[in-house]
């Protein structure tokens, strides 16, 4: 599940965890609520604790402790798990929830939860997150597979996918597109708030990535932006290099040794300076699928 901030992700995570703790119909259920740090996990756990006290005001069935919740009727337990915990083994999860997976540097915690489910008859693993700005991390890889499943390029009948995101050709500044990323628009977050955030990003390019990833749930390629894409596009034009034949030209080359692109930049001097950049991918790399997929 991928959706922007202020859409009730934490409440949904807490509700799912408590459902699988109480109503999954499995004796000795073990629910793992996982995050990238103890502080992050505590936010979701505090919501679980609050909900549990609302469900069972007298504490007859549900008992909330500092880092776990016990459901006495079936001897089931909800536990908090963080990537920075010293011990990440010995679990027997019936349900696992990964919160804000976009920030996970590795898939270690997800792998631990999945591998602990082998003895369960009906285990479930839920990943819930906003977009991020590092497409090399496990979350974006999982997202890529999910989209391939949605597009029927891959098959996985056990995978439920909900991605609330802009389409590739959508203008992130256009108010008509915001409903795509905010299913709770004007319920848990107002159009006025999003409009203010977007205007802030337009006025200050350094805020653009934060607004696009968190408010508009759009994956970006870096944590900060010095110049916006629109500013760069306005400064570009199509130029025919052959028209500069005979003029001084400086060439810079960045060769690719493994799976990267080879880049060549040309600087032609003719009173003013003209920059040109070209990328190449060698035929041998195209013929090697594993390298091609790494680009």
Where is each model-derived feature located?
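Residue-level detector of conserved catalytic or cofactor/ligand-binding positions
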Residues: 281-295
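Phosphate/NTP-binding elements of NTP-utilizing enzymes
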Residues: 1-253
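Ser/Thr- (and often Asn-) enriched beta-sheet segments in non-cytosolic proteins
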Residues: 68-70, 275, 295
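Gly/Thr-rich phosphate-binding beta-strand-loop-beta motif of the actin/hexokinase/Hsp70
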Residues: 245-268
């Amino acid at each position: 599940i991928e959706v922007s901030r202020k859409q009730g992700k934490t409440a949904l995570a807490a509700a799912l965890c408590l459902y699988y703790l109480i109503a999954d119909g499995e004796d000795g259920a073990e629910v793992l609520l996982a995050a990238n740090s103890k502080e992050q996990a505590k936010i979701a756990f505090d919501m679980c604790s609050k909900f549990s006290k609302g469900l069972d005001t007298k504490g007859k069935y549900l008992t909330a402790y500092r880092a776990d919740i016990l459901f006495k009727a079936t001897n089931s337990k909800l536990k908090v798990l963080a990537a920075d915990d010293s011990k990440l083994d010995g679990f027997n999860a019936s349900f696992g929830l990964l919160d804000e997976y976009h920030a996970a540097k590795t898939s270690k915690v997800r792998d631990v939860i999945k591998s602990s489910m082998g003895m369960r008859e009906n285990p479930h693993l839920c990943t819930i997150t906003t977009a991020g700005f590092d497409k090399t991390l496990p979350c974006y890889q999982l997202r890529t597979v999910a989209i391939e499943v949605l597009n029927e390029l891959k098959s996985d009948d056990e995978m439920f996918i909900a991605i609330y995101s802009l389409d590739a050709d959508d203008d992130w500044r256009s108010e008509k597109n915001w409903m795509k990323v905010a299913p709770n628009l004007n319920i848990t977050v107002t159009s006025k708030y999003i409009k203010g955030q977007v205007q802030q990003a337009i006025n200050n390019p350094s805020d653009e990535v934060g607004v696009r990833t968190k408010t508009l749930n759009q994956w970006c390629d870096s944590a900060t932006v010095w110049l916006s894409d629109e500013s760069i596009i306005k400064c570009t034009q199509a130029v025919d290099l052959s028209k500069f034949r005979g003029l001084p030209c400086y060439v810079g080359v960045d060769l690719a040794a493994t799976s990267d692109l080879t880049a060549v930049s040309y600087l032609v001097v003719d009173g003013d300076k003209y920059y040109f950049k070209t990328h190449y991918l060698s035929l041998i790399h195209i013929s090697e699928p594993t390298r091609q997929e790494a680009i």
